[in-house]
């Protein structure tokens, strides 16, 4: 999965915010049917990855940027380990973030000829454990207690059929990221279902 946190802003002040759709689009463009992410073993090769689910966090239309966007990428393996996949995904997310920031800065320089402001976003790409650790270091036991309570509610919602595994996963990421400083961030990871290698 990939989760992108942006910075909320009105569409009329788009350069004051960070649109997660922009970054997620770059990540999708670099991963969708990318043969470098396909796996091979002997004379077999998997089909390349494809995105199966994606949405922003808005529950209704308004004229603000979405605060976050997330999606699920299907990756088939023959020999790659989860670690192999995550390392490749981390690099793509980092490269995508750098490219989007570079493009934004160029456009912002043109815009800033008319406005005296600066853009200071930095690349921040972490796995779920990275944001969990950051939140735990910032808020300690109060975070851990709230996390356990949230996890319990998500498990109950999933068990009752009120939540899908996707909904529960992204709600948990959204919950944890709410505890860390609000800045553009990409969170990546694996989530069920995880199947054995294809044959």
Where are these regions (language model features)?
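Substrate-recognition/cap regions that form aromatic- and gly/pro-loop-enriched pockets
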Residues: 151-199
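Midchain, well-structured core segments that form catalytic/ion-binding scaffolds
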Residues: 1-147, 151-154
